[in-house]
């Protein structure tokens, strides 16, 4: 199909230009597989680090489900889930966490503050904001960690379990 040829050309071009050392693509619905191809030094069993793509695959999808069910609203604020949040972070909304506009920076290492993953919320909320919420986007994993903890509270289960 022509659409899959476009995907093939794009992935091949990226490989040739050095954008990545290898790639794999598959398109299917249910048990039906319409397109499957690998590029570079990999095969269909090669594991790839999805890194930040997981934001789309996990918390964003769960948040969308909770939004659809009415269990979460884009206007819900950090204070709704963490009543002890510091004043400067209380009004950060779910939408701001999802769009990287909550003012939360991403320039510190958790290991400098704690070795316990359970302290994540306390560490994030205790760290100074880089700017006021609602400003320009600042790409940050920390906002998504906070969002993940909110979703865990709503869903009653860990996202990584």
How should these model regions be labeled?
Residues 8-12, 25, 31, 49-75, ...:
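Active-site SXXK
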